[in-house]
Amino acid sequence: ITSNEDRYMEWKTKDGKYESSQFIDYDTFFEGIFIKERFIDIIKNFICFSKEESGAAKILAAYHQYFAVKKAVERTKKATQGDGKIGVFWHTQGSGKSLSMVFYAHLLQDELSQPTIVVITDRNDLDDQLYTQFSKCQQFLRQIPIQAKSREDLKSLLAGREANGIIFTTMQKFEESDEPLSLRRNIVVMTDEAHRGQYGFEEKVNEETGKISIGTARIIHNSLPNASFI
C-alpha cells in the first residue's frame, strides 16, 4: 500500500489458464487470489523483501509470475526424475523476469531435496545484474548466492558439492573436460538470455585440422549430465 500508483497491478486470471479482458471484474480478482490454499501460498512463497539503498522493498508476485512459477516448479519435479528438460519460461520485456527467477529459486528449495541452482548467462553485465537481485533477496532465499569468478572457481564450487547453493556464472567459464563437475540429479540450471547454451550439441570436424569440436550447450550438459535445464 506504500507503492507508487504505477506499481499497482491487476490480477487477471482465476486459475492461470485464461487472461481476462483489459479491465478485470471483482469475481476474477477475488477468485484468483482469495481461495484459501492459494492465499496462504502467496503469503508464504510469493512475497519477498528486496534490500534496496532506501530500505527494504516489499514485493508481491504478479499473477503471471505466480502461475508461471508454480507450473515451472511442477515441470522441474518431473524433469529431475526424467529427461532433465524443464522447458522455456518466456517473458516480455519489463515483466519481472529477474524476480520470477527469485520466486522460482525460493519455491524449488521446498519442493526438491536440497537442490543446487546454477544460473548461467552469456554476458558479465547480466551475470552481475542477476547476482545483485538475488543478493538483495538472500533472506527470502535462505542462503547467500555465490558468483563464480573464474573457471577454476566454478569447478571448486560445483565439484564435490552435495547440496544447496545458488551459483552464478557465465557460460564461457565452462570448458571441455573428460570428467563431469557433478553427477547429481537435483541440480537445476537456469539459462537467461544465454542463447548459445541452447544449441551446439553435435560434434563438428574442422576440415583443415581434423580437430573435433563441440558447441557450448554440449559442454555445459557434459559438465552436468544429470542436471535439469530451464
Question: What residues fall within each predicted segment?
Answer:
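ATP-dependent helicase/translocase motor core
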Residues: 1-116, 125-141, 162-166, 186, ...
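Conserved catalytic network of the ASCE P-loop NTPase/AAA+ motor domain
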Residues: 110-112, 159-161, 180-183, 221-225
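Hydrophobic positions in the central parallel beta-sheet of the AAA+
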Residues: 119, 167-169, 189
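Conserved helicase motor
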Residues: 124, 146-155, 170-176
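Residues immediately C-terminal
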Residues: 126, 173, 196-199
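Conserved motor-coupling elements within RecA-like helicase/translocase cores
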Residues: 149-167, 180-181
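SF2 helicase catalytic motif II
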Residues: 182-228
